[in-house]
Design a protein with these regions (language model features):
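Glycine-rich, often proline-containing surface loops adjacent to acidic residues and nearby aromatics
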Residues: 1-3, 88-89
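Conserved active-site segments centered on acidic
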Residues: 2-57
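Hydrophobic, Leu/Ile/Phe/Ala-enriched alpha-helical segments that form helix-helix packing faces
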Residues: 21, 25, 29, 83, ...
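Mid-chain, well-packed structural core segment of small domains
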Residues: 64-103
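Ser/Thr/Gly-rich flexible loops in soluble cytosolic domains mediating phosphotransfer, phosphorylation
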Residues: 87-142
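C-terminal output/effector regions of signal-responsive regulators
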Residues: 143-149
C-alpha cells in the first residue's frame, strides 16, 4: 500500500484537498492500494511549533512520501537542511496542486518515490524541473512527459 501525506502549514487548503482526494479514492475503489492523510508539515517531523497543536511527535514513519503545498518551499528547505526529514518530500507544482485528481497524485507520489529510491536527495525534484513550484503542468510529471512526445 502506498501511504501519502498531504502537507501544508495550517491545514486550510490541504485538509480540504485531502478530503476531496479521499472521496476520489473511494469512488475509484482504490482504498486498498493507497492511504492518504492530511498532516500539517510541522507535525510531520515533530517541529517545535507543533507544541501549539499538542502533536509534538514525528509522524514520518506513518507515510512513504509527503507531498507539500507549494508555499512550503522555504519551510521544507529549512527542515531538510536541519536533518529533520528522513522520507521523500516533494513540493507540488502550483497548477497541479489546484487541479489535482487522485490518479495524477498517485502517479506523482510513485515517481517521487522512485527518484528517492534511486538516490535523488530531498527536496525531491524531477530532473527537468529543478524547482517544481515553477512548473506549469496540470497533470502528473509522467503524463506531462507522455503528452510532450
Amino acid at each position: 500500500m502506498l501511504r501519502i501525506a498531504i502537507c501544508c502549514g495550517g491545514g486550510f487548503s490541504s485538509s480540504t484537498m485531502a478530503a476531496h482526494l479521499n472521496k476520489q479514492l473511494a469512488a475509484k475503489h482504490l482504498e486498498d492500494k493507497v492511504f492518504l492523510e492530511f498532516i500539517p508539515f510541522a507535525n510531520l517531523y515533530g517541529d517545535d511549533s507543533a507544541f501549539i497543536t499538542g502533536t509534538h511527535r514525528d509522524r514520518q514513519d506513518e507515510v512513504d512520501v509527503a507531498l507539500l503545498c507549494p508555499h512550503l518551499e522555504f519551510d521544507a528547505k529549512r527542515a531538510v537542511d536541519a536533518g529533520k526529514i528522513h522520507i521523500p518530500i516533494f513540493l507540488l507544482p502550483m497548477r497541479l496542486y489546484g487541479l489535482v485528481d487522485i490518479e495524477n497524485l498517485i502517479e506523482e507520489a510513485e515517481d517521487v518515490l522512485e527518484l528517492w529510491n534511486n538516490g535523488t536527495p530531498n527536496i525531491v525534484t524531477f530532473p527537468d524541473e529543478p524547482r517544481s513550484i515553477m512548473a506549469k503542468r496540470t497533470v502528473s510529471h509522467r503524463r506531462w512527459i507522455a503528452q510532450s512526445k
